[in-house]
Amino acid sequence: MEVAMVSAESSGCNSHMPYGYAAQARARERERLAHSRAAAAAAVAAATAAVEGTGGSGGGPHHHHQTRGAYSSHDPQGSRGSREEEATRTEKKKKLHHRQSSFPHCSDLMPSGSEEKILRELSEEEEDEEEEEEEEEEGRFYYSEEDHGDGCSYTDLLPQDDGGGGGYSSVRYSDCCERVVINVSGLRFETQMKTLAQFPETLLGDPEKRTQYFDPLRNEYFFDRNRPSFDAILYYYQSGGRLKRPVNVPFDIFTEEVKFYQLGEEALLKFREDEGFVREEEDRALPENEFKKQIWLLFEYPESSSPARGIAIVSVLVILISIVIFCLETLPEFRDDRDLIMALSAGGHSRLLNDTSAPHLENSGHTIFNDPFFIVETVCIVWFSFEFVVRCFACPSQALFFKNIMNIIDIVSILPYFITLGTDLAQQQGGGNGQQQQAMSFAILRIIRLVRVFRIFKLSRHSKGLQILGHTLRASMRELGLLIFFLFIGVILFSSAVYFAEADEPTTHFQSIPDAFWWAVVTMTTVGYGDMKPITVGGKIVGSLCAIAGVLTIALPVPVIVSNFNYFYHRETENEEQTQLTQNAVSCPYLPSNLLKKFRSSTSSSLGDKSEYLEMEEGVKESLCGKEEKCQGKGDDSETDKNNCSNAKAVETDV
């Protein structure tokens, strides 16, 4: 029975008993069985000896020996086998007499039996013991603390690795039913080992990483973590890589759990995309050349130094001046003179002969090159061009530089000036070639001048609010596309309906379905200019339905856009707090070296570990720099506080 029990356990299906305590239990069970069998054998041997002592004459046994001898003379092989069997029986009888002397008090407890039966039981017992010894030598189960000696610890009872990376290689469990118990803050989970082994780089999938959380007393892994989050973590292993956040778990808490269980950056990024956030851009590397690095920091990172902050202020002022000039030149007081100057520069003298204002402009020598607006525009373009060329020279990667949307905006804001300048020079060199060509050149110049309005987006390089707005719009492209699609369907539907509803009205404003597009857009967006309105009852009903549908259409995607805006706003706020903390920490000479290394290695990204951020903040508060700030901020302190502050200053002096 014991052999069957051991083989069943070693086949790989009973993995819930602690390995060390299971070995101890088996050892105690074997010891009890050995004592009970020895006592029974001693009792039977005593009874047999008593029967043989009262059996009469000694001829009986002598007769048996003669019979066996006669039989063995006819069969030599049988005689040899019988002699070996006789020797075995004699040896076992000696063991019986030895056990009888060890347990003389058990002779009255067991009934008498035949010698053959006793020998058969002893033979089975020895075979069982030999099989158990072979299994222990093969390493099917661990030894108990008695086998290890008095110096055995719980760490010795943990599953050992043979170096092959298999984890529990010394325990021959079957992969199909080897199970593991995981305790998360008192909530027990049970799964198969092969399920966790699908992701060997994670905390639960790597035997070496999870061993530190193993509890040998209960044969389970204990994690003092968030319990509701582990349902999704375990489902990640069971589903082969699908990570879904539980509804009752906040986003930041679940993100911390994903990082703790080391599911990987790819799983975290995929989870963030499923939650509706855009994939974060990788941190841009700095140039390797020290000179280029300093230039890049000056023009790209205004917060890096005071000169960089000054360059950013100059850039913002130039952008504002350019935008103001772009708006002022469209005033009627300046627009007429500027158009005449451009016409004179283009060679349109014949058209301006009858213009009363033309002679004084032409006689005064006004050209586009001495126009005040052109001069100010030239100064702004010189700065924009200088800034763009320097940043292009010092950038770490030319390919990434020209792919950046901000740099594309810089190019678009610079090109119109050079195109306009080239067109003016070509017109002066070629002279007037007809009114049609002049009209064409004026139209092109107006379009090119309109492109200059994109310079306002250059402010987003120095404005956190515009950056947050840009991130929000980019993260909400799916919702914005859905909103536009719904509006498109509504415009087509309601413009057609109002056209046919107003078709019989002679004074209607809706002469065609395309004419009704404007009314449908204005009504669905709840603007309602009133320039076009339905007159009939049917048209008014259609207008009412159009307004209600517009409210519902716009209201559905708006919460998602607002949620994205709140996320980017809070992320930027936390980023500013973390940057301020980092600057204060680096300037503190009394901060521990391990925390100082974290501060210096931390980037400007606000997606860092929140626990690490809190740890760094606590380190700053507990350092001598934090105590110094407390001492400076207090006016009326107790005697103990004054002594603490003086001691802190003394320590600073010693340092």
From Swiss-Prot:
Catalytic activities: K(+)(in) = K(+)(out)
The annotated regions of Acidic residues compositional bias extend over 123-138
Residue ranges annotated as motif Selectivity filter: 526-531
Topological region Cytoplasmic: 1-306, 395-405, 463-477, 570-655
Its record classes its membrane topology as: Multi-pass membrane protein
Q: Name one GO cellular component term.
A: presynaptic membrane
After translation, how is this protein modified? N-glycosylated.
- Spell out the protein name for this chain: Potassium voltage-gated channel subfamily A member 4
- Which source organism does the UniProt entry give? Rattus norvegicus
